């Protein structure tokens, strides 16, 4: 396991053993609070910088990074998460990045969603990524 960056994780939602494991494996973790402090553009740039000279990057858009108010259909979302706008901006910037070889969207349970809020947010993330891809 090398060159892993996690962006937007919840500060209180991760167990201490998970945090220790991430540190031991040199996983670069940026909390949602840190994203808000430095802005999503700077955060994405920093995460890509951490990945260094990796020729190809895979991006997992985990809907759990969103604040619970915006993602009732994401099983582990909670208060204090990212906004859909922040995640869409990240998706657009990552779509522009030539090293990104593929993406997926995870942690989405439509059966637990309310008024398709989370599903619509996931679709907006995908569309934002594709808009970035088209601008390459």
Listing of model-derived features with the role each one plays in the protein:
Residues 21-136:
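Catalytic cores of soluble, metal-dependent hydrolases
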Residues 12-24:
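Short, glycine/polar-rich helix-capping loops at beta-to-alpha or helix-loop-helix junctions
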Residues 1, 13-15, 31, 83:
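General structural signal for secondary-structure boundaries
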Residues 5-10, 31-35:
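Flexible, glycine/proline-enriched loop segments at strand-loop-helix junctions
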Residues 10-13, 63-65:
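Glycine-rich beta-alpha junction loops
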Residues 1-3, 7, 97-98:
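Active-site histidine-anchored catalytic micro-motif
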